[in-house]
Regions:
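ATP-binding N-terminal substructure of ATP-dependent carboxylate-amine bond-forming enzymes
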Residues: 1-104
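Short acidic-hydrophobic, aromatic-tinged amphipathic segments that line or gate anion-handling sites
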Residues: 51-58, 131-135, 166
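A conserved helix-loop-beta module that forms one wall/lid of the active-site cleft
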Residues: 99-162
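Short, flexible turn/loop "capping" segments at secondary-structure junctions
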Residues: 155-157, 337, 388-393
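Internal nucleotide-binding/catalytic subdomain
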Residues: 163-293, 298-305
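Active-site "cap" helix and flanking loop/linker of ATP-utilizing ligase/carboxylase catalytic domains
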Residues: 258-285, 301-373, 383-384
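Generic C-terminus detector
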Residues: 385, 390-436
Length: 436
């Protein structure tokens, strides 16, 4: 396939920080008009775009109608909900070019068992021991066979908050049993099934890719921190922050780790094509753990990571529209990344993630923070009183780059010290003790 016309009007579907930085990147092309479809009025996105609509991210008809109204040339789907309901299929029926997976490919994220079962079927050896259960009591029996040292995962989408692990959120076997019952009783993930897998130990990292069929462009590895409290303690969150190193690797990785992870991604895409006859396309996020038994896949997301996308785009020199056009056209052109480290930290309301839908009461001078070399990204929206409100997302991300992780961290810490209000954050992200 080739792009048959110039891309002059772009729609970004999503509401948060990763959409804001996506729009910032595209905006560097002065001849492109940008539109946003959001479920919450993100003040930063509103200030950047030529037009926007607030609506239900699960309403594919409304998204298609808005795209048609604005005569969109290219739609970028960067959030999970519209992908899971088939918005890509619906847009393509209207001959709108889309960068995002169709409904079948989106199952690599929306159904946690799908990718695992696909990889197991084709002998891709990057998996922990796992089984999928429709019966809660069989799930409990399997967890007991693994000596309760398990990760318990609802099958469907849970905004990054559904996975619980023995020894962390699940303190003992009673907690494991109770959580399995809770998944079925409360229909967490909406699927009526649960994935039980062995608990992995090791260092996690993420690789994000641009994918179009058999063409793939990889980006620098990023390390994110999902736990709420310093020292990787407390409950899981959607993520409290992340860092990347200068070059493509993290301090605990080598080139072999990176290439093996990319190889696992490529094999998964190839067997998906073999089984379905369909190609994958979009932003693919692969999260891996480096264990004593080799690399293991934690999960795939078919969208940019938040906050990992902030680290990546902060140092990407190229424009997204150009990268995607070259990829679709099959033109082999390198993507350039600045040789800098990055650190990103989220400030979140106190009580998060246990308490959702809170107002984030903070005051700061954005211009002074920007002058430090720190960028501000919003994963929060304005309510009807003009207050910043955090729903299932987090709050505000601050991200900077430097010659080293430590230097980038120092600048972000200085920026956070300039923010007044009632919030919490992870001071240790980017600090020497967490760079491993």
């Amino acid at each position: 396939m080739t792009v048959k016309k110039d891309i002059k009007r772009v729609l970004v579907v999503g509401s948060w920080a990763k959409e804001q930085i996506t729009i910032e990147n595209i905006k560097k092309k002065p001849d492109v008009k940008i539109f946003a479809y959001m479920d919450t009025k993100n003040p930063a996105i509103v200030s950047l775009v030529d037009g926007y609509k607030i609506g239900d991210l699960g309403d594919k008809e409304q998204i298609v109608n808005y795209a048609k109204k604005e005569k969109i040339d290219l739609a970028l789907i960067t959030t999970a909900q519209p992908l899971s309901v088939g918005v890509v299929n619906a847009l393509e029926k209207e001959n709108i070019l889309v960068f995002g997976p169709n409904k079948k490919a989106a199952k690599l994220e929306s159904d946690k068992a799908f990718a695992r079962q696909l990889m197991k079927k084709h002998g891709i050896k990057a998996l922990p021991k796992f089984k999928v259960f429709k019966d809660r009591y069989k799930a409990i029996n399997y967890a007991e066979k693994l000596d309760w040292k398990v990760a318990v995962k609802p099958i469907g989408l849970t905004e990054g908050l559904g996975v619980k692990i023995y020894g962390d959120q699940l303190k003992n076997q009673d907690d494991v049993v109770d959580y399995i019952h809770k998944i079925f009783d409360k229909k967490i993930g909406g699927d009526g099934k649960v994935l039980i897998e062995e608990k992995l130990e090791g260092a996690e990292f993420t690789i994000q890719c641009f994918v179009y069929g058999k063409h793939i462009i990889t980006t620098p590895a990023v390390k994110d921190f999902k736990r709420l409290l310093p020292g990787d303690k407390g409950p899981n969150t959607a993520s409290m922050g992340s860092y990347s190193n200068n070059g493509f690797l993290l301090p605990f990785m080598d080139q072999e780790d990176y290439l093996e992870a990319v190889n696992i991604i490529m094999k998964t895409l190839n067997v998906f094509n073999n089984d379905t006859g369909e190609d994958c396309k979009g932003f693919l996020y692969g999260q891996f753990m480096k264990t004593n038994d080799g690399l293991k896949l934690i999960e795939y997301n078919f969208r940019p990571g938040d906050p990992e996308w902030l680290n990546t785009l902060l140092v990407m020199d190229d424009n997204l529209v150009d990268v995607i056009k070259y990829l679709i056209d099959g033109v082999e052109k390198p993507v350039h990344f600045e040789d800098k480290a990055t650190v990103c930290k989220y400030i979140v309301p106190k009580g998060y993630p246990k308490i959702m839908n809170q107002v984030l009461n903070v005051k700061f001078d954005a211009k002074k923070i920007n002058n430090l070399g720190v960028k501000i990204y919003y994963s929060s929206g304005l309510d009807n009183k003009g207050k910043l409100r955090v729903g299932c997302e987090r709050g505000i991300a601050l991200v900077s780059k430097g010659d080293t992780i430590e230097k980038a961290n120092t600048v972000v810490e200085k920026a956070i010290s300039m923010i007044d209000g009632d919030f919490q954050y992870r001071k240790d992200i980017g600090a020497e003790e967490m760079i491993r």
